[in-house]
Amino acid sequence: MIKKAVLPVAGFGTRFLPASKAIPKEMLPIIDKPLVQYAVEEAINIGIEEIIFITSPEKYSIEKHFEVNEDISKRLTKSGKLELLQKANPEIFSKVKFHYVNQDVQNGLGHAILQAENLLENQSFAVLYSIDCLLNVFPQRLSYELGQFYPFVLEHNKV
């Protein structure tokens, strides 16, 4: 089973300009969560245990988003806003280990994925595109189908 996923998020986001001028495209909100969070949650739901972000120094907000913010946690706890606290620091994030690798020069998708080589340790891995967002009213079913697809590929492609 695949346990690691690579999320290439270092790109400049030129197709999303002017919206991506100040906010990384992966952090643009869809309803109440940034786009990249949907990809991370889907990965966790199909059993991914490690997520490797290929990022750039300008995209520090992605790393900040997946960290627990102690100041916010204290304020929300003190004011009794526990539901909001759960949204700010989802428990699901504790089920996965996050890695951040800087891609100093953007030389395409293949180059971005290659930046994760040391963390992948010759294991099978998934590549997730955080800007591809499909919302599904039956998320468990989609996760199940994606999980079933991998053994099929192994069997038929002798990967």
What kind of region is each of these model predictions?
Residues 10, 56, 130:
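Cofactor-binding loop segments of dinucleotide-utilizing enzymes, especially the Rossmann-like FAD-
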